[in-house]
Amino acid sequence: MSKGPSEKVGIMAGDRIVNVNDTAIAGVKMKKEEIMKRLRGPRGTTVKLGIVRRGVPDVMYFTVKRDKIPVKSVDAVYMIRPQIGYIRIGNFGATTYKEFMEGMEKLKAEGMKDLILDLQDNGGGYLQAAVEIANEFLPKDDLIVYTDGRRIRRMDYKARGNGSFLTGRVYVLVNEFTASAAEIVTGAIQDHDRGIVIGRRTFGKGLVQRPIDLPDGSMIRLTIAHYYTPSGRCIQKPYTKGDIEDYAMDFEKRLKHGELTNRDSIHFADSLKFYTLKEHRTVYGGGGIMPDTFVPLDTLQYTKFHRQLVLKGIVINTDLRYIDKNRKQLVGDYPTFEAFRSRFEVPQELIDEIMKEAEKQKIKPKDDEELQRTLPYLKSQLKALVARDLFDMSEYFQIINETSDIVKKGVELSAGK
């Protein structure tokens, strides 16, 4: 973990822990829970780890001082084009706002004028973090979100007017897995005409729930209100009372209906029409946030064969073995990310290894045409995974974003203005 306790004492990615406090944990029958129990402990205490490192003949010993492990929620921060910054938020947690502001300051120092805010696959998190980030883009007293329920008084969350990015253009990237707190930020920016939303309709998760403890130690979450965007749209997608299966199958229904691949398949009743608050553009309710610019899911690029390779763990496991075997050479050949990005090409041996493993697990493409469609994205994914292992998550996204239609559309619109 970057900047974690282990990294501070010299433990590297790819090292293998073989014993903890002189007790062997490798090559013995020990449950994962027991291993974690030995590794964990009170903050400030120490643990002695025996490490095996490729190329080093003897076990290496490190004494690690237990500490809080930093878990980042901002996945990537970089200049995607001159004057255009890019920030990807993976979820909204306790440190998200702080990380976001650090990223904004970095990008401003590098000349950012406009921002691409990537909320794809962001499942939500803390409401307060979402409100704080939306506040950075909106003038004083602009409504960010409100909650309302049958027996709960309406509560408004408004911008304080002290945001640090009140004039630059904002482009918000979303998809069908953008949910909850991420939808709050998206809805606020769209309703106030503060930016352009790009991608596909978001998930539609906007419930305010109260936990109630039961005598047997279990707990239920009682829905007491819903979240609404500034224009009055309910974020929560509709559900029929008692029909859990229908609610759970929403993604499959969207895919079957063609909503993810063709905007023309999406129809809204007049009752679901709302209007943005500054420019009075038409936006739609009915659950989730409908983007201003639709980008279809590329079903040609994401083949069934590729999905099987990923689901079976073949891609990630083959990448880890490749990194473990070649780390020293890779670090020497590519001392900087710029060198890696411009010169590294996925070797054929890595592709061959994946195909060999796929054959072992009886996974194969339908035909050569599917294989050829799979290879470009597979190679991009492998290069991104190698970048992540050699550098960090931000470098992973700098590679993988080159194949993302939603990111490319964001860059196109921001560059064209």
Spans of model-derived segments:
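Acidic/polar loop patches that form or flank catalytic/metal-binding clefts of enzymes
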Residues: 145-146, 196-200, 230, 234-237, ...
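Generic structural signal for buried aliphatic residues
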Residues: 17-18, 47, 235, 283
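Extended catalytic-interface subdomain
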Residues: 210, 222-240
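Active-site rim segments in enzyme catalytic domains, especially the processed small/beta chain
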Residues: 218, 224-225, 229, 245, ...
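Conserved functional hotspot residues or short segments at active or partner-binding sites
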Residues: 234-235, 239-417
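Cleft-lining beta-strand/loop regions that shape enzyme active-site pockets
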Residues: 1-12, 18-24, 28-220, 226
